[in-house]
């Protein structure tokens, strides 16, 4: 089993790239954003964790994500402590996900994790792929999601620079030109990896 980690700025197209690995080489994808969403929605322990740090963000046992975002945008010591606890929960779920797939006939696992390198999730990867888009396209994508400029700038500050990501990665995929171009890069990376590990799909 080969573990691929995706790193890239917010709005760079990591989820698109992950979906193409799933489509073309049947990779199983660990989507950390989706995991966190499910934790906020359904995990009573995480809901209680949120409530213990940010009481106004839980109403009738439901996490108010808009209210929680307010605390994220403050990004103070309280948020950092909460985030550390949440990351440890996500890390365990990721480990269980990898272990579960290692027991199956799974060729590729793709980790679609924000702050992959910054939070040291890349340490369990065989290869790291840098997903890159130009800053104008990133902003356009995020505006469509309804993200504020302040939120975009905060998240950008928390992330490594593109130069650092590229230096710490094995491959780079550029998004934004066309979907066919992204697909060709995915297939080329699969070919290179298979050549290195001596196996074929």
Curated annotation (Swiss-Prot):
Location relative to the cell: Cytoplasm
Q: Name one Pfam family in it.
A: CoaE
InterPro entries this protein is in? Depp_CoAkinase (IPR001977), P-loop_NTPase (IPR027417)
Name the EC number(s).
2.7.1.24
- Its primary localisation, in coarse terms, equals cytoplasm
Q: GO molecular function, one example? A: ATP binding
Keywords assigned: ATP-binding, Coenzyme A biosynthesis, Cytoplasm, Kinase, Nucleotide-binding, Transferase
What is a biological process (GO) this protein takes part in?
Answer: coenzyme A biosynthetic process
Positions contributing to ATP binding: 11-16
Which pathway does the protein contribute to? Answer: Cofactor biosynthesis; coenzyme A biosynthesis; CoA from (R)-pantothenate: step 5/5
- Disulfide bond annotation, renumbered to this chain: none
Q: Which residues form the DPCK domain?
A: 3-201
Q: Which reaction is the catalytic activity of this chain?
A: 3'-dephospho-CoA + ATP = ADP + CoA + H(+)
Residue spans crossing the bilayer: none
The keyword Transport is annotated on this UniProt entry? no
Recorded GO cellular component terms are: cytoplasm
Tell me, what does this protein do in biology? Catalyzes the phosphorylation of the 3'-hydroxyl group of dephosphocoenzyme A to form coenzyme A.
**PANTHER family given for it?**
BIFUNCTIONAL COENZYME A SYNTHASE-RELATED, DEPHOSPHO-COA KINASE-RELATED
Q: Which protein family is named in the record?
A: Belongs to the CoaE family.
> Which HAMAP family does this entry report, sorted A to Z?
Dephospho_CoA_kinase
Q: What is this protein called?
A: Dephospho-CoA kinase
| High-level lineage | Bacteria, Pseudomonadati, Pseudomonadota, Alphaproteobacteria, Rickettsiales
């Amino acid at each position: 089993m080969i573990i691929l980690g995706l790193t890239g700025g917010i709005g760079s197209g990591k989820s698109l790239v992950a979906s193409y690995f799933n489509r073309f080489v049947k990779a199983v994808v660990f989507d950390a954003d989706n995991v966190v969403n499910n934790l906020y929605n359904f995990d009573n322990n995480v809901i209680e964790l949120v409530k213990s740090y940010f009481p106004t963000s839980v109403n009738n046992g439901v996490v108010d994500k808009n209210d929680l975002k307010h605390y994220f945008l403050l990004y103070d010591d309280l948020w950092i402590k909460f985030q550390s606890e949440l990351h440890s929960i996500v890390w365990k779920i990721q480990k269980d996900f990898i272990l579960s797939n290692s027991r199956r006939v799974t060729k590729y696992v793709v980790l679609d994790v924000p702050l992959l390198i910054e939070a040291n999730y890349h340490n369990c990867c065989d290869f790291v792929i840098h997903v890159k888009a130009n800053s104008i396209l990133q902003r356009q994508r995020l505006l469509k999601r309804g993200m504020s400029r302040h939120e975009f700038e905060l998240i950008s500050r928390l992330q490594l620079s593109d130069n650092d990501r590229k230096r710490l990665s094995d491959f780079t995929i550029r998004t934004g030109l066309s979907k066919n171009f992204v697909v060709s890069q995915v297939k080329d990376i699969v070919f290179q990896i298979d050549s290195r590990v001596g196996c074929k799909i």
